[in-house]
């Protein structure tokens, strides 16, 4: 069975990871998906400085940055003043999948949290899932981000692992965040 291919040519991404090796490895994966030059950084301050004058289509960040938590940076991005950037899909990577870190990232407004080490196939699947699953964007008093309730959303790899998942079948989602280049790249289907 042929695997789908994702071509991220024209998609801009910000990759934040304090570990140089991990950052380089993930950047190589993104280039393998067709992304020409992901912007990389180590700290939340670097990200904030870059984002004040630039736009991105995807943000991939470590859950704990040297100067702040990923959740703090996500909340900063999801503020109303950030206009277009507040809807950017955010993938949080973590080596420590402690409930506290995962909950903080989710409650901050992350689209998905992925445990490291991450394989190219796993990263591909998660990026594709984030782009394809139209989760409603919630803008409430204490929270701004994708709907945190996963009860009606298919698993990222499409594999139903529980008996009640198979009975429920694929879901349909409501209105989502605006379409960006990432969503368009995934919607085009396999690259040629």
Identify the residue ranges that each predicted region occupies.
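CheY-like receiver
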Residues: 132-192
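C-terminal output helix
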Residues: 100, 118-131, 135, 139-141
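The feature encodes the CheY-like receiver
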Residues: 66-67, 98
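Active-site residues of response regulator receiver
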Residues: 62-64, 94
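Alpha4 helix (beta4-alpha4-beta5 surface) of REC/receiver domains from two-component response regulators
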Residues: 27, 72, 86, 97-112, ...
